[in-house]
UniProtKB/Swiss-Prot annotation:
Source organism phylogeny: Eukaryota, Metazoa, Ecdysozoa, Arthropoda, Hexapoda
Region (RNA gate) location: 291-305
Assigned protein family: Belongs to the eIF-3 subunit D family.
Keyword set, alphabetical order: Cytoplasm, Initiation factor, Protein biosynthesis, RNA-binding
Name of protein: Eukaryotic translation initiation factor 3 subunit D-2
Cellular component, GO annotation: eukaryotic 43S preinitiation complex; eukaryotic 48S preinitiation complex; eukaryotic translation initiation factor 3 complex
Superkingdom per UniProt: Eukaryota
Signal peptide stretch: none
InterPro entries (UniProt xref): eIF3d
Chief location category: cytoplasm
A GO term for molecular function: translation initiation factor activity
Organism: Drosophila virilis
BP term (GO), one: cap-dependent translational initiation
Positions of the UniProt region annotated as Disordered: 116-149, 532-554
Length: 554
C-alpha cells in the first residue's frame, strides 16, 4: 500500500461549442449586490425625525438606492407583524405635560444645526409631532430669535447667498495694482492729527427751530417737501478747490469722499472713487451720474433689503427715499423766511445759480497736516446754526434716520419704543446702519460741528413711501458720539493716509478705488484717462477738467 494519499483528478466540464459552463445555473434566486464597506442598517430608529446632512446616506448601498434591478421585494404579507409601542400613547396628567420639554429642547439645539431653513423641527408642518407650526422649534425658537434680533438665523448657513453687484463694471484694460483686506486696514493708526484749520468759509446758514425738540410720538409732525437745491459737485468741479490747488495742499477731496474711505471697513455695498494724480497732487473725486450721493438703508443688517427692483422696499427705492427724507428734514427744522435771521460767512455760496433757491448750507474748506509733507484740503459743510444759552454760535450737522417697515427690517417699532426706550431704537439703528452713521459722524467731526442732530422719520403707512412724519429728535456731540459707536478716528486717519501713500507712489494718471461687492476688501485699479468718457455727461469733463489738470501738471 502506498504511503501517499491518492490524487483524484477533478471533473472538468469541457464546452466544445463555446466558452463557459455547459449547464445553465439555477434561476429565480434572490440576489442583492453587497460591498464589504457598506454599513449595517438598523431595523428601526426611535430617535427624533431629524436627518443629519453629513451622514445622510450612511446606510445606503454602495451600488445606489435607486437601482431597482437587483432590489428584493418581499411579496408575502405577514399579518402578525406589529410595530413595537404602536398603540395610543398614555394620556398625561396636567402636571406631567411639561416634564420632558427641556430634554426635547436640547435635542432641537443639537440636531437642528444641520437642518436647512426653519422647517425641519417645528416648522410649518408641525415639526416633531406637532401640527400647524406648533412644534418644538416654533415654541422655543421663535421668541428667542425675536428677542435677539433674529440671531438664531445663524443656523441658515446653507441658505443661498445673493451676490451683490459692483458699483462699476471692471473692464479688461484696467490694471489691478493692489488689494487690501479690511483686517489689515483695521490695524492702521495715525494718532495726534490736529483739528483742521479754516482756509475759506462761504455760504449762508439759517437758525435751528428749537420747537422741533418737542416733537415726540404723541406730537408728531408731518414731513414737508422743501423745494430747495443742495449742490454737491465733485472735487475737480469745485471752483474753490481749483483756486486753492494752485497755492496750497497736495491732496484734495470732499467730506463725503473722505468719510467713505475712513469708514470703508464698515461698508458692505460696493462703491468707487476716482483718483487723479498729477505730480505731487492727488484729487479724490466721484464719477458723474454715479449713486455715490445716495444714502444706504439697512446696509449692515443681518438681512438687508432684497426686494426686486421696482418695489418700494427695494434697495434702490429705499436709498432714494432716504436721500429725499434727509434733504427735506434738514431744511424743515430750520426757521425759513425772509424775515428770519441768518448767519453769513465771508464768501457767498460758490454754487449759487440765478433763479434757483439754494438750501441752507455753509461750506468750510479746511487744511490738515498729515505728516511727511502730506497736506489735505477738504470741503466740509454745516446745515444750520443755533445760539447756546451763553449766546455763542454753535454749528449743526442735521441728519435723519428713516423707518420703512419694522417687520421686514427686523427692527423695533418706533411708535412703541421711541419715547420710552430711545436707546433701544438707536442701538437697532447702529446695528442696521453702522456704516451710514459712522460716515455722518466723521463728516461732523471734519466740519467741526458742535452738535449732530438726528431725526427719526417714519412712514405714515408702511406701504406708502411718499408720506412721512417726524417722530422725534436727538442730539449728540460728534466726538462723544464717535466714542459711543466705537469709531476710532486714529484708525480712520491711518486708513486715509495709507491709501494716499499708495497713490503717491504710482506714476501720474487716473486710478480708481473700489469696494469689492462681496468680499471685505478694497481694490486699486489703474484705468485709462478716457475710462468713463462713454458716459452721458462726461464730455464736459473731457473739455473742461482736462485742461485744468494739465495746467496743474505744468
Amino acid at each position: 500500500m502506498s504511503q501517499y494519499a491518492p490524487f483524484i483528478k477533478p471533473y472538468i466540464e469541457y464546452n466544445q461549442f463555446g466558452w463557459g459552463p455547459c449547464d445553465m445555473p439555477d434561476m429565480e434566486v434572490p440576489y442583492q449586490p453587497f460591498c464589504k464597506s457598506d454599513r449595517l442598517g438598523k431595523i428601526s430608529d426611535w430617535m427624533m425625525p431629524v436627518q443629519e446632512k453629513k451622514y445622510a446616506n450612511k446606510y445606503a448601498s454602495t451600488f445606489g438606492s435607486n437601482n431597482s434591478q437587483y432590489a428584493y421585494f418581499h411579496e408575502d404579507d405577514d399579518a402578525t407583524f406589529h410595530l413595537v409601542d404602536g398603540g395610543n400613547p398614555r394620556a398625561l396628567k396636567p402636571y406631567q405635560r411639561n416634564r420632558y420639554r427641556p430634554n426635547q429642547r436640547n435635542n432641537v439645539r443639537v440636531h437642528g444645526r444641520n437642518v436647512r431653513g426653519n422647517a425641519a423641527i417645528g416648522g410649518g408642518q408641525g415639526g416633531a409631532g406637532g401640527t400647524g407650526g406648533a412644534g418644538v422649534g416654533n415654541k422655543y425658537g421663535k421668541g428667542r430669535d425675536m428677542r435677539r434680533g433674529n440671531m438664531g438665523r445663524r443656523f441658515m448657513r446653507n441658505a443661498p447667498v445673493r451676490l451683490r453687484e459692483s458699483s462699476v463694471v471692471v473692464r479688461s484694460d484696467w490694471v489691478s495694482i493692489e488689494e487690501i483686506d479690511f483686517p489689515r486696514l483695521l490695524k492702521l493708526s495715525l494718532p495726534n492729527i490736529k483739528d483742521g484749520v479754516d482756509v475759506v468759509t462761504c455760504g449762508t446758514l439759517e437758525y435751528y427751530d428749537k420747537q422741533c425738540d418737542r416733537i415726540n410720538v404723541k406730537n408728531e409732525r408731518p414731513l414737508q417737501k422743501i423745494d430747495r437745491i443742495i449742490n454737491v459737485p465733485g472735487t475737480i468741479d469745485d471752483p474753490i478747490i481749483r483756486r486753492l490747488s494752485k497755492s496750497m495742499g497736495n491732496v484734495f477731496a470732499t467730506d463725503d469722499i473722505i468719510a467713505t474711505l475712513m469708514c470703508c471697513t464698515r461698508s458692505n455695498y460696493s462703491w468707487d472713487i476716482v483718483i487723479e494724480k498729477l505730480g505731487t497732487k492727488v484729487f479724490l473725486d466721484k464719477r458723474d451720474n454715479a449713486q455715490f450721493d445716495l444714502l444706504t438703508v439697512n446696509e449692515t443688517a443681518l438681512e438687508p433689503p432684497q426686494d426686486e427692483e421696482g418695489s418700494i422696499n427695494s434697495p434702490q427705492s429705499l436709498s432714494l427715499e432716504a436721500t429725499l427724507i434727509n434733504h427735506n428734514f434738514s431744511q424743515q427744522v430750520l426757521k425759513i423766511g425772509e424775515q428770519e435771521p441768518k448767519h453769513k460767512f465771508d464768501e457767498p455760496n460758490p454754487f449759487e445759480e440765478p433763479g434757483v433757491e439754494l438750501a441752507s448750507v455753509a461750506y468750510r474748506y479746511k487744511e490738515w497736516q498729515l505728516g511727511d509733507d502730506v497736506v489735505l484740503i477738504a470741503r466740509c459743510k454745516h446745515n444750520g446754526v443755533i445760539k447756546s444759552p451763553a449766546g455763542e454760535l454753535q454749528f449743526l450737522s442735521i441728519k435723519a434716520l428713516n423707518e420703512w417697515d419694522s417687520k421686514a427690517a427686523n427692527s423695533v417699532e418706533w411708535r412703541q419704543k421711541l419715547d420710552s426706550q430711545r436707546g433701544a431704537v438707536l442701538a437697532s439703528e447702529l446695528r442696521n446702519n453702522a456704516c451710514k452713521l459712522a460716515k455722518w459722524t466723521v463728516e461732523a467731526v471734519l466740519a467741526g460741528s458742535d452738535q449732530l442732530k438726528l431725526g427719526y422719520v417714519s412712514r405714515v403707512n408702511r406701504k406708502d413711501h411718499l408720506r412721512h412724519v417726524i417722530l422725534g429728535m436727538q442730539q449728540f456731540k460728534p466726538q462723544e458720539f464717535a466714542t459711543q459707536i466705537n469709531l476710532n478716528m486714529d484708525n480712520a486717519w491711518g486708513v486715509l493716509r495709507c491709501l494716499v501713500d499708495i497713490v503717491l507712489k504710482q506714476p501720474d494718471g487716473k486710478y480708481l478705488i473700489m469696494k469689492d461687492p462681496n468680499k471685505p476688501m478694497i481694490r486699486l485699479y489703474d484705468i485709462p484717462d478716457n475710462a468713463f468718457d462713454s458716459d452721458g455727461n462726461d464730455d464736459e469733463e473731457t473739455s473742461d477738467d482736462r485742461p485744468f489738470l494739465k495746467s496743474l501738471g505744468n
